[in-house]
Structures are given as structure tokens and as C-alpha cells.
Amino acid sequence: ASNLAMALAKKYRAVMLIDADLRNPTQIRLLGRKAMGKEGLDRLLQGTDLSENRVMQAAAYDEETNLVTLISETPCRNAAKLLASPDMAELLSVVRKTMDYVIIDSSPMGMFADGDMLADVADHTLLVVRQDVVSACDINDAIDAISQGKATFLGCVLNNMQTGSLLSRISGYRYGYAYGYGYGRESRGGRSEEGSR
């Protein structure tokens, strides 16, 4: 999500990255403290004021990357409740007015319903897939779940692909979701045994 958001922001577009993985926020680790605004997404959704002014004050802007970020720093126990609330839809409605693109990072598909809930309030969805982690059957199940939302499913993005391995493993047909980040247990091969996005 952060790579896509930064690539779009380099085109001098107004881009906001929202870390909606409230269970295990990872964007703070990827982007650093400069990406943390005055308030995290969780605190913003628990408040009563979702005006454009308040939302933009809560977010952080990085002049170097031209990226606006709205992220959380610590895990939130009531993530599903906050993401399913009318406030999340209202927040997206507010930022759509000022941003050209709003990129939302969610928790892994298949482990939590967060991605399904966000697919109901987003315009489009992409499934980020990491090679050799989860079976093609699980990917198809995730696509089916996403496709039932209101957002248009745009497709999959292959992440962490090993050079030359696609052709050599075409018969194996195993790919995985680009996540992990503390959700799955590590297997002997260093791959997450569970956790999909």
C-alpha cells in the first residue's frame, strides 16, 4: 500500500495513505515517525468531529514524498467495530473531496473481516499477493469475498516475486498474500504459515 501511495504521490497528485489495519499497524514501521500525525485513525474514529479540517489536522504530510498519511501507532482492540461504523464511511467521504487518491491498507484477508468491511466503503480494491505463502484456493476465496463488496475488484498485485520462479513453479500454482507482519507463525522455511490478505 505504501509503495503504491508513494508512486502516485510522486506524480504530484493529492494522495492519502490510511493504515486501516488497526489490529497491527505496520505503516508506522515502514514509513517512520514522520508519518504519524496528531491523531491516529483509531482515535479519530472514536471522536465526534470528522470535519475536513479535523481530519487533515490529524493526518501527517511529508513534503519529501508529497504523501498525506493517516495511521495508527498502537494496536486497537475494537478494530472491527470502528471500521464497520458509519464514521469510517464518513471519513472516506470527507477525504474523497480533497484527495485524488485514497489508498487504504487493511489487515489480512481470511483472518479478519476488516478487508470485507472496507470493500463496502471503498471505490476499488486490489489484492496484494506474495509468492509461495498461501494456496491459490485461498486467494480465490479472498477474491470471492472482496467481490461481494460494493467496490470494483481491480485484480491482484504480485509482491516479493523471486526472479525466474514464476515459470519454474507454474505447475505448483502456489502464491500468497503480502502480509504476515506478526500475524502468522513462522514455518521452518521462514514463511508465514497463516495470515493472508
Task: Describe each model-derived feature in a short phrase.
Residues A1-R197:
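P-loop NTP-binding module
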